[in-house]
Every structure is written in structure tokens, then in C-alpha cells.
Design a protein with these regions (language model features):
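C-terminal segment of classical bacterial N-terminal signal peptides
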Residues: 14-23
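N-terminal secretory-pathway/extracellular module detecting exported/lumenal segments
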Residues: 23-86, 95-148
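Bacterial N-terminal signal peptides that target proteins for export
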Residues: 1-10
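Beta-strand-enriched accessory nucleic-acid recognition/scaffold domains that flank the catalytic cores
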Residues: 90-91
Length: 148
């Protein structure tokens, strides 16, 4: 019996070495097939997605960059009556010196009050989504025609 258990453990160990699991958490997730609604905050049943076509650079200084985008509540239950609902505008602030990332929204005027939440966990989905959001915001802002 002991040899069977040792053999089974060896098999499982070698199998794990031969077929390592992929790190799926490092891949950005999208709510739609067109990859326009990027999920930046997620749970098991629902999350938040930003509309990449709405992302723009609001402020760009030597100290930080602020990006705004329309934010949506998304539910992963496809049978839900409204799988996607508009929430508000979400703002991301990146410190250029420290690379710290902060988030706030229009909800309860938090952006206007200057209330920012620092993202401390490097493994959150926001860390994987932010570079994509930033790239699109810069691209979208360049495409805005100058007003005369």
C-alpha cells in the first residue's frame, strides 16, 4: 500500500512538472467579444468594466497622469435581465515617480472631493487592466480634434 501511495505521489509530481498550469490571472479579461469592455475589478459573480472607447487622459503632469473612462457594473450570469449597467465615471491616477496607482469615481462626488483609493495588491485585476486602459486613453486623447 505504501509503494502505491509513493508511486501515486511521484506520478502527480511528475505530471505537474510536465504540464504546468498557465497563469490565467495575468491575462486581461473582457466582457464582450469585441474587447471594448475591459474588466478592471472582478469578483466571482460580478465585476466592473470600463468602456475603452471612452477612456481619455484628463490630466498629465510631471508627477502623475489621470485617466477617466465610463464604468459599468457587469454580472457574469448570462440569464440576468441586465448583464451590464452603467455606473458612473471612474478615474485612475498613476504616480510617475513611484508607479503607485489610485482609483476613484464620480460616485458621491469622490473625484471632486479628491478622495483616492490606493491600489496596494499587485495581483488585482486592475494591475493587469491598467496598462491597456492607459494605452487606449492616450490613443483616444490624441484622436480628439482640437477646438478652434
Amino acid at each position: 500500500m505504501r509503494r502505491i501511495l509513493q508511486g501515486l505521489c511521484a506520478f502527480v509530481f511528475l505530471f505537474a512538472l510536465a504540464f504546468p498550469l498557465q497563469d490565467v490571472s495575468a491575462k486581461p479579461m473582457y466582457f464582450d467579444d469585441a474587447q471594448n469592455y475591459l474588466i478592471w475589478d472582478t469578483g466571482t459573480h460580478h465585476g466592473s468594466a470600463v468602456d475603452l472607447s471612452s477612456a481619455v487622459v484628463v490630466k498629465d503632469t510631471p508627477e502623475y497622469i489621470i485617466i477617466a473612462a465610463l464604468d459599468y457594473f457587469v454580472t457574469y450570469d448570462k440569464s440576468a435581465e441586465y448583464p451590464m449597467r452603467s455606473k458612473n465615471t471612474v478615474y485612475f491616477k498613476e504616480s510617475k515617480q513611484s508607479a503607485h496607482l489610485y482609483v476613484t469615481s464620480d460616485f458621491q462626488n469622490r473625484y471632486q472631493k479628491g478622495e483616492w483609493h490606493k491600489i496596494t495588491n499587485i495581483y488585482t485585476s486592475i494591475r493587469h487592466a491598467y496598462p491597456i486602459l492607459k494605452e487606449r486613453a492616450i490613443q483616444n486623447t490624441k484622436n480628439i480634434p482640437a477646438q478652434s
